[in-house]
Every structure is written in structure tokens, then in C-alpha cells.
Amino acid sequence: MDCGSLVSADALIEPWEETTRTFGRGSIRVAVVDLGEPACCPQHFIVLLPANMYGGRICALVARNALVPNGWTHVGLHEAVSDRPEGGGLRITVPVYGYDPRTGTADPDSRRDISVLVRQAAGTVDLVASD
């Protein structure tokens, strides 16, 4: 979904060296954001593309739920990988972790891999798979 009014610069988590990565020869940036709610799972990630022919930079928010953007307890951006599928584009796969109410932290056994397909020329970011 479009970042729109949901994500502002103050949602970026610091240090940026640990919570942002670039893909596609540096033209595509993925960043972890903290939207503050819900308390158990406020982390999401955004995908930023360079400006297209229509204007400004493209920002896509990747959340667990599009209606009420719930996130995850932890987004493992340092474990993210990318590849180029046969149909074109760039697939970026980011592991995410759910909440463990027993410990109040991320549950290592709850790992899910979320994949998005980025088509930079078209200016699109689409969810393609989640475990």
C-alpha cells in the first residue's frame, strides 16, 4: 500500500546503517519503520523507488494487514535477500517475526518470509508471497 500519510520520516528506526538496505544496484531502498502501534508489533518495512515519469519518489508500505496496518515484532532486514525471477522485476524477500507473549519479544519460531516484486520501470511494488 502507498505510504501516504501512514509513514513519516520520524517512523524510521535508527541507526539507519542497521535498518536500511539497498537493492537493484542501489536504486531500491528498503527501510524498517516503527509506527508505534500496536505495541506488540509496530515494525513494518517500506520500499522506496526513485521518482518515475509522473513525479515524486514512490513509497510502498508492507504491513501484515492493509485495513489496519498491523506489523511485526521484528523485521529481519539484515537477513533479506533479492533475486530476479524469470518474469522480470526484482524480488526482495524479508523475514519477519511475530510476538511471543511469554517473553514480550520476537518469537524466533514465528519467522515468515515476506516477498515483494519490484518493477522499477512500472513504479510498482507487489506482495508476491508470504510463508
Where are the language model's segments positioned?
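Exposed acidic/polar residues on beta-strands and adjacent loops within beta-sheet cores, strongest
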Residues: 1-131
